[in-house]
Amino acid sequence: MARPVPIEKLRNIGIVAHIDAGKTTTTERILFYTGKTYKIGEVHEGAATMDWMEQEKERGITITSATTAAYWKGYQLNIIDTPGHVDFGVEVVRSMKALDGIVFVFSSVEAVQPQSEANWRWADKFGVPRIAFVNKMDRTGADFFKVYDDIIEKLGAKPVPIQVPIGSEENFEGIVDLFEMKAYIWRGDELGAKYDVTDDIPSDVLPVAEEWREKMIEAIVETDEELMEKYLEGEELSVEDLKKALRKATISRELVPMLCGSAFKNKGVQPLLDAVIDFLPSPVDVPPVKGVNPDTGEEEERHASDNEPFCALAFKVMADPYAGQLTYFRVYSGVIKAGDTILIANKNKKVRVGRILRMHANQREEITEVHAGDIAAAVGLDTVTGDTLSDPNHPIVLESMEFPEPVIAMAIEPKTKSDQEKLSQVLNKFMKEDPTFKVTVDPETNQTLIHGMGELHLEIMVDRMKREYGIEVNVGKPQVAYKETIKKKAVGEGKFIRQSGGRGQYGHAIIEIEPLAEKDYEFVDKIVGGVIPKEFIPAVDAGIQEAMQSGVVAGYPMIGVKATLFDGSFHEVDSSEIAFKIAGSMAFREAAKKANPVLLEPIMLVEVDTPEEYMGDVMGDLSKRRGKILGSEKKGTTMTIKAEVPLAEMFGYATDLRSLTQGRATFSMVFEKYEEVPKNIADEIAGAKAKAES
């Protein structure tokens, strides 16, 4: 089976935005104009093609990143639609690994919002080129140039408008293409499929277009010496040369082309598709992926070529009600065929590939092979998100994905005892699908706790248990995922001796612990002269890690600790792994109590949009919640207030904000950092936890 298109004509793109910026609507229009759907699905009607889970249709938000292939002017676009809601940010992170370029959708009214900032930082981290699409130009308060300023100020990027709008709010008619200096005007009612292209630019828009064309040319020539010389010598620059230079500068992430439109009103989407082709990279335009050969330990590269050994990344795993487990994978090099045996390289496990599907939201087309650069889904592979798939004869392990830690937990139990086993199978399935969803058992109360990125995240998981698997559960109140850490160095000694007839137990370890900023835990072995035999040292490490699961302040997991084992002793006959594990735990607990232990809590970055008259009340309320106000700014008719607030104080905030502002304010929050809890509150938390467990 040949490639559908040459690799140079392939674009793997993500569509990313803050919730409600109109991202799913934009994706729907793209699918309509590329001929993938015959009827436009509106989000507010619950009919959007990409939002295929029941809960998405009800809530009008995108939860899982559906992927679909579409075709435009001889190019294949693999589009990944990602959620804008903060609780599902993990979907954005994992799809970044599969992408070569991103369309960032911004609302022309709200401009750059918190989740967009968070996603932009992730795109920086993964080095993904992007273009900006300013949507909702038909809305009251629409301001294309305000978004331009915001992108510079908040994202530290260099946007380059390649269009300017013709009109705005209810008078928004179309755009001026600054390369060709032509007006694109959408008038008819053919769902935006037809539009006029004319040299006749409205007289009130012409001076604005001329000014911004000059700015566009200046920004582009600054990235290209040859063009700069021509420009300074007064030579006319061809559109082709300018576009070529902008493509290069977009791929190198020096510039961000900026476009505008109204997806809902069917205006501006076709030029956006042209820009995806013109400026975003194909798989051969991005650097090769790097990984480690597990046999040699050497770093190796894989280029986007069918002739190199097969290498792919499983970037998403989902349970499918009809096909079983689906593994979405991005092929970086080589070719994979249905029936091939491949290696899950990070687990050194061979598996046979059965059926391969090309996905369109939740519909599928069976294909026989996938080539370098392409994205597809395999049925029934035993993988988890982040696994590397490779040619068994040329193994390579790609860098694994990092995901944010869950910040909220909730106790659950099945309503009927008979569902207990089924529930644990389903929870395991969910953990495979979603790396930010975790399940633990509280050692004190024996309760099952589910952990996630926010209340909505956990609500949807509970809803899925009932809908997809018929399991009804009782849920407890949401709890904050507190952590503990230490603030100074301390030494601890653990000696475990048991004599009870026959063989005894003997383990003795002395450790020093100290604060560690850059990671959660590090173990250093400084034993000399064999005072503890080598085979028992991992047991001390395991004992320390076990003790860290239940800290000394209030029994929460400890983070940010470096532990150095430097002394101890052993007994020729009685020493054992279990004795040293217990000694390690004892030594850690003794040291931790002396190391100025403190409680940490998740701090959220909260952004509230409120009419001006409620501003004082909203700020006062945030301060009462131990919030630190970072600032406020006027956006159209509303004020935007930014604050850092402990998550513990934000439960039920949506209801309180509604009553405070008569339902006129909205808010969003993103996890920011862990911070020390004030002593008086830490004492209350520790007391409440001890009481609950007694």
Swiss-Prot record:
Which SUPFAM superfamilies would you find in this protein's record?
EF-G C-terminal domain-like, P-loop containing nucleoside triphosphate hydrolases, Ribosomal protein S5 domain 2-like, Translation proteins
Any one GO CC term of this protein is: cytoplasm
Tell me the PROSITE patterns matching this sequence. G_TR_1, G_TR_2
Q: Which GO terms describe its molecular function?
A: GTP binding; GTPase activity; translation elongation factor activity
Q: Where in the cell is it found?
A: Cytoplasm
Binding-site list for GTP: 17-24, 81-85, 135-138
Report the InterPro entries cross-referenced here.
Answer: EFG_II, EFG_III, EFG_III/V, EFG_IV, EFG_V, EFG_V-like, EFTu-like_2, G_TR_CS
In this chain the tr-type G domain maps to 8-284
- According to the record, the segments passing through the membrane are none
**What are the recorded Gene Ontology BP terms?**
ribosome disassembly
The cross-references to Gene3D superfamilies, in alphabetical order and at most eight, read: 3.30.230.10, 3.30.70.240, Elongation Factor G (Translational Gtpase), domain 3, P-loop containing nucleotide triphosphate hydrolases, Translation factors
Sequence similarity: Belongs to the TRAFAC class translation factor GTPase superfamily. Classic translation factor GTPase family. EF-G/EF-2 subfamily.
Q: What exactly does this protein do?
A: Catalyzes the GTP-dependent ribosomal translocation step during translation elongation. During this step, the ribosome changes from the pre-translocational (PRE) to the post-translocational (POST) state as the newly formed A-site-bound peptidyl-tRNA and P-site-bound deacylated tRNA move to the P and E sites, respectively. Catalyzes the coordinated movement of the two tRNA molecules, the mRNA and conformational changes in the ribosome.
Q: Which HAMAP family match?
A: EF_G_EF_2_B
The name this protein carries in UniProt is Elongation factor G
- Source species, please? Persephonella marina (strain DSM 14350 / EX-H1)
Q: Which gene specifies this protein's sequence? A: fusA
